[in-house]
């Protein structure tokens, strides 16, 4: 559904990954979606140039996140939240395989 709204499946998957993790590197998106690195980097660069995303370097890794100063972020996040909240836990576990930090014992796997 998001691919039809945003006009691009790669962009839709990038937005879902950003919504889930809040901050991601391109390799994680590639791993989670099975999309090629060139396609992911092209979309990330376009969104950064448009002011939708911002990035920072940590060592040799570039981390991307939504630009909190952009007026478009709130409506974009609301659209993504509708899709994300309607996804089953199994689908979320399948799509977002990598954990960003350890989970406390007894805590839910997906928010």
What is each PLM-predicted segment?
Residues 1-11, 25, 58-80:
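Short, cationic-aromatic polyanion-contact patches
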Residues 12-16:
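Pre-recognition alpha-helix immediately N-terminal to the DNA-recognition helix
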Residues 48-58:
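A short, conserved structural fragment
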């Amino acid at each position: 559904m998001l691919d039809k709204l945003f006009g691009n499946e790669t962009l839709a998957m990038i937005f879902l990954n950003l919504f889930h993790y809040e901050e991601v590197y391109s390799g994680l998106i590639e791993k989670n979606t099975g999309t090629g690195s060139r396609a992911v980097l092209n979309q990330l660069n376009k969104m950064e140039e448009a002011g939708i995303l911002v990035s920072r370097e940590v060592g040799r890794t570039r981390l991307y996140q939504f630009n909190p100063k952009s007026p478009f972020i709130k409506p974009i996040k609301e659209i993504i939240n509708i899709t994300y909240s309607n996804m089953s836990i199994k689908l979320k576990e399948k799509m977002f395989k990598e954990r960003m930090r350890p989970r406390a014992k007894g805590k839910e796997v997906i928010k």
